[in-house]
Amino acid sequence: KAAIKIQIRDVDNFIHKDFHNSKDIRYIKKTMDTKLSKESYAKLVETIKENSCITMATPFDEKSVHDCVDLGIELIKIASSDINDWVLIEEIAKTKKPVIVSTGGSSLKDIDDLVKFFQNRSIPLAINHCVSIYPSQKHELDLNQIDFLKQRYPDHVIGYSTHEYDEGVELPIMMAYAKGARTFERHVDIDYDKDSGKCVSPYCSNPENLDKWVKAYKKAVEICGSVGEQRRIIPKKETKYLDALVRGVYAKKNLKKGDKITEEDVYLAVPLQKGQISCRELMAGEVLLKEIKKDKQINIDDIDSPYAKNKELQEIIYKRGI
């Protein structure tokens, strides 16, 4: 199921008052330019719910954590930059809401400490592999870290939060899923500058490319198939194909009723025919119940064998082959 995540800041206090009008610090300028009222956040949250998505938010300060509670946010995200902001983390933990954390630029100790903190409080925690380079090049994605996180934190869901260039994002999400990531996060933007035809930020996807990204995820799920903890269910067409390659048992010479079959009496060859025993069922000492001419097939009904008494196996042998 999809979650739509918003970012919440108490902007007037999050940014020092002396820098409110700063134009040369991009992060501050962007934050000031995109400031929203609590009413606007409430409208966003309501729209998310109306579209049957999970409500999720990244609070960047303590007041914003309280806003998450007031807005009925279901899932809280801790940004990579805040993985050791313990004032904020303590406030988030008080909500008892499930948490996802991104690990971009974090030390192993930072991650271990955070995992232990939430484990000790029995608060569900998912851990995202993340590279905090905006935007990231393909060679910077380090998807093998998904393997590392899965091995180190086996009791937690591992995900993938990406900031790569918008073009060609399909392959990395497919690889991430194949490696075991099970939550996926990407920034979304809209082309409000119609003349440029580009997203505001190169690490964001516009709705059209996000659609490709989600479809790539679904294709990865289809390609990877069933869960990896148990043997897959073999489709009938695969079994039928392999049965056509299995060698059947044929008489090497004329054989009499009552003969005990030895390897000198038979040979193996394709095709395997319906009702015929194959190399899989051939056992030395099986007794013939009827005469078999040279080069003729030996069927399951022609021998006294444990296989002949297994009704389920009999049915398989009757139906397989040409």
Predicted regions and their residues:
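Catalytic cores and adjacent flexible loops of soluble metabolic enzymes
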Residues: 1-322
